[in-house]
Amino acid sequence: MSNGSRSLNLFFSKNNFKGSFNSFNEVPNGNLPECCFIGRSNVGKSSIINAITKSKKLAKTSKTPGRTQNINLFVIHDKINIIDLPGYGYAKVSKMKREELSNLIENYLINRENLKEVFILIDCRVGIKDSDIDILDFICENNKQFSIILTKVDKCAVNFINKQKESLISLLKNYKTHFKTIFSSSSNKNIGIVDIQKEIFSLT
């Protein structure tokens, strides 16, 4: 492990869970810069957050889609907040609950003034879906910067990963004003985690 990677791990390992909130107005205000993680249900948001923070239990993981239904706030080294937003695109919740979660996500993305970057997670095996594109459109309409994290790349062949990235790059030409980069990642194999850490650290 390089000294740079070791320093990043030390930075991110100083973390704490500040709370879980089912209303945007409940989320504490503060002066720290903030980034958020968003994606379809069961895309691996909590696992990636745990890999970044070198903590197995900071963000609660579940094999059950739709488990994250609140805004979860984590503070890293008293320098930056990481937000885990509810997953979207899960059909087995009621229409009323889907609307409630959609409003929660939209209120956060519109009104959070210290939000510096949105990380949109996409399962590499599945690729981008219409619900992801809806989120991309909404983020850009509200003038937020975003990056894409392709998750679970350890479960895909290299050629398949490259095709998924090529497809994304072609699509993202339409979003070049707000798009930053694409990360390939695996929480199980620690692939791409240092690069994501560097990006988050650059926001502090």
Placement of each model-derived feature along the sequence:
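Canonical P-loop GTPase G-domain recognition
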Residues: 11-24, 155-204
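Structured catalytic cores of enzymes that bind and process phosphorylated ligands/cofactors
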Residues: 42-43, 49, 72, 78-79, ...
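Conserved C-terminal guanine-recognition region of P-loop GTPase G domains, centered on the G4
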Residues: 104-179
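Helical mechanochemical/support elements of P-loop NTPase systems and associated helical scaffolds
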Residues: 57, 67-70, 81, 97-101, ...
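Conserved G1/Walker A P-loop phosphate-binding module
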Residues: 1-92
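Conserved nucleotide-binding/hydrolysis micro-motifs of P-loop NTPases
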Residues: 67, 80, 87-90, 125-127, ...
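Conserved nucleotide-sensing/catalytic segment adjacent to the nucleotide-binding pocket
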Residues: 77-115
